[in-house]
Amino acid sequence: MNKTKLALAAILVVIAATAAALAVGTAPGSAKSGAAFKAAWIYVGPHNDGGWSQAHDQGRLAVQKALGSKVQTTYKENVPEGPQVSQVIESLIRDGNKIIFGTSFGFQPAMAAAAKKHPDVKFEMATGTIIQKNMAEYYGAGEDAIYLSGIAAGAATKSGTVGYVVPFAIPEVIRHTNAFALGVQKSHPGAKVKIIWTNSWFAPDKEKKAAESLHSSGADVLGQNDDSPSAGQFSEANGNPR
């Protein structure tokens, strides 16, 4: 993930996590017992992936640092989108967590179901389309920064072909891909943007192979929307702007 998106994700998690700060001391019995408010994050990849999940974990650590002993944070990593999400959520609730951050789009169905089942727990989705009384969605206009990165990519390409590695064809990713392509065309009219779908949020090997394929097809500048830094690392190793 590029540095702009990494910083944006970290900032957004910190902003969204203020919900935990507001809840400290307001949960039933918390003020009397002095018990720390428990907050949990669920990651689709490893917490130190060098990209999306790591940005969220930096947000978690910032919350822990800001609130100190008032909050106890935890995380579950490498949770695949599917039935396992519900199991992880239920486990976190049994452990006493009162706010849960789901950081992958595919966690949404399980998060929404859990929100209905546990009205006393708060749920925060990083990107999503479902809002409930105790479930919110947080994100920002990432396409603005991605449009600017597209302008930079268009200005840097000499071959007139820019490559872009993307995960899933969901609205958010399509919006970001369009923004990148429009940015390329803004600074380099007539330039082409070639994309490869990895159909995975975090798959370093797939992302590297996609970058190799785009490079072989003539793309001399590469961008990415996946979670790991693999595409960027390949680009850097081969002297391509990224």
Residue positions per predicted region:
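A residue-level marker of the well-folded mature domains of exported/periplasmic proteins
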Residues: 2-9, 23-24, 29-242
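Hydrophobic alpha-helical membrane-insertion segments, chiefly the h-region
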Residues: 15-25
